[in-house]
Design a protein with these regions (language model features):
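Extended acidic/polar, glycine-enriched regions
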Residues: 127-130, 201-280
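Conserved, mostly hydrophobic/aromatic
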Residues: 24, 105, 172, 254, ...
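Accessory beta-strand-rich segments of carbohydrate-active enzymes
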Residues: 6-11, 15-16, 25-31, 63-181, ...
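Short hydrophobic beta-strand segments in globular cytosolic domains
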Residues: 108-109, 222, 293
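Surface beta-strand/loop "capping" patches
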Residues: 176-206
Length: 454
């Protein structure tokens, strides 16, 4: 069976990492009593599940499609000897919806949201006598305060609502890093000056350390800069001796190496990539790298018959993109779901444009207070995907038209637009696709399902 063992974060890879996908212990806890009865310290659970596939899917080995309000996972882990002295980071790419993670029965941390990755430094919770992880996820898509996308809020699928996804549905993995290391980066291209600006997040231990950033194209160095880490988040601009543009159908990518040096003996090396391209919207249309382009996009909902939210293999992600391109499309609107990073990685390589959306359905957008349930995860999504050249635009909401006599909250729409623009002004923003005009929007789109081309 394919447990999806490829690296889940190809834009930032360290040498020392380990997939935790595979067979885990599993138990449904609809009464949600396990948290009070010490399930996090149990030596086993009642069933087995194939991670990263959700328990509703056939590939999980469970195939339970009724509502599951609480689910538990457990597995033993082994820390390689060569990781000794490093920080051990535990990563979850996505788990729906409210998740608590325990290591050896002790709480490592929690996360709210079903679509974005989260991580914990578990170094201090590890033991020399063996280690195990326990995960508890609560999920209830039937209310109006939780984003759920097109997961059905009824027992069965109906209309354009499909089988639900509960708990872990993307990869779980560990990596070892030095205390001083890079956490994430975003990129911004300046074609006129032939340079790229990285906005880099560092750990606190990185302050005062040296960082060397090296760009390569086809294995040849085309730029390098060395500086001192003076802030947890800082910008680094790197001039390039060769300018190769990322284009539709030709995803030209540079390799990038970040080396954080803390003293003479300790250095953390992480490798990634970036693309050079600029997007712009003018009165006469959309422009990529200064040339007017027509976006012919497919609506991709990212559901799979056997894996539901989770692609059965990495090859399936590539096949989806290549099929779309073979039909004459040059991009996709990733609809009501946050796709896994490897989809964007393949879109980057193939020159396939993407509008990044989230699964806002399920959230009552007439209530401005729901910003607390939406905005934190939306910011996490933007920060996750800002390094991908294939992502040319953001779409936080879809079709939030009047419902039961309630109007969408313009205060909510305006706040989300302003927040998105403040984080990333380099991409297009369609605040609300196919709905009423918003108080702030880069462009307004219409969903027209007329089948007669005349």
């Amino acid at each position: 069976m394919d447990f999806r063992l490829e690296h889940p974060r190809p834009e930032l890879v360290r040498e020392n990492w380990q997939s935790l996908n595979g067979v885990w212990d599993f138990e449904i806890d609809n009464a949600r009593v396990g948290i009070w009865n010490g399930y996090e310290k149990r030596e086993s659970l009642s069933d087995k599940i194939n991670v990263p596939f959700c328990p509703e899917s056939r590939l999980s080995g469970i195939g339970h499609t009724d509502f599951m309000y609480g689910v538990w996972y457990r597995r033993d882990i082994e820390i390689p000897a060569e990781w000794q002295g490093k920080r051990i980071l535990l990563h979850f790419e996505a788990c729906d919806y409210f998740t608590r993670v325990f290591v050896n029965g002790k709480l490592a941390g929690s996360h709210k949201g079903g679509y974005t990755p989260f991580s914990f430094d578990i170094t201090e919770l590890l033991s020399d006598d063996g280690n195990y992880i326990t995960v508890y996820a609560e999920d209830d898509p039937t209310g109006e305060h939780q984003v759920a996308g097109k997961q059905s809020h009824r027992f069965n699928s109906y209309g354009c609502y499909y089988t639900r996804t509960t708990g872990i549905w993307q990869s779980v993995w560990m990596e070892a890093a030095e205390p001083a290391h890079i956490i994430r980066y975003a990129t911004s291209s300046n074609l006129a000056q032939s340079n790229v600006t990285f906005t880099v997040d560092f750990t606190e231990a990185s302050l005062g350390a040296d960082v060397i950033v090296t760009a390569l194209y086809d294995g040849e160095e085309v730029g390098q800069i060395e500086t001192v880490v003076n802030s947890r988040r800082m910008t680094i601009t790197l001039p390039l001796s060769e300018l190769r543009l990322w284009e539709i159908g030709n995803g030209r990518l540079y390799d990038i190496v970040f080396e954080v040096i803390d003293g003479e003996e300790r250095s953390d090396v992480a490798k990634g990539y970036f693309g050079m391209r600029e997007v712009m919207l003018k009165k006469d249309g959309f422009y990529l790298n200064g040339e007017r382009k027509f976006g012919r996009f497919v609506l991709d909902q990212g559901f799979y018959p056997d894996g539901l939210y989770t692609a059965p293999s990495d090859e399936a992600l590539v096949a989806d993109i290549k099929a779309s391109m073979s039909f004459g499309f040059n991009g996709a609107r990733l609809h009501q779901k946050v796709f896994e990073r490897r989809f964007l990685y393949h879109a980057d390589k193939l020159g396939y444009m993407v509008f990044d959306e989230t699964g806002n359905w399920g959230l009552n957008t007439s209530d401005p207070m729901n910003v607390y349930n939406f905005l934190p995860e939306w910011i996490e999504e933007i920060e996750r995907d800002m390094c991908h050249p294939s992502v040319i635009g953001w779409c936080p909401f879809n079709e939030t038209w009047d419902k039961d006599g309630r109007r969408q909250s313009n205060e909510l729409m305006e706040l989300v637009y302003n927040t998105t623009y403040a984080i990333d002004a380099s991409r297009l923003i369609v605040t609300n696709s196919g709905s009423y005009p918003c108080p702030k929007n880069d462009c307004h789109d219409v969903h027209d399902y007329e089948q007669d081309p005349e």
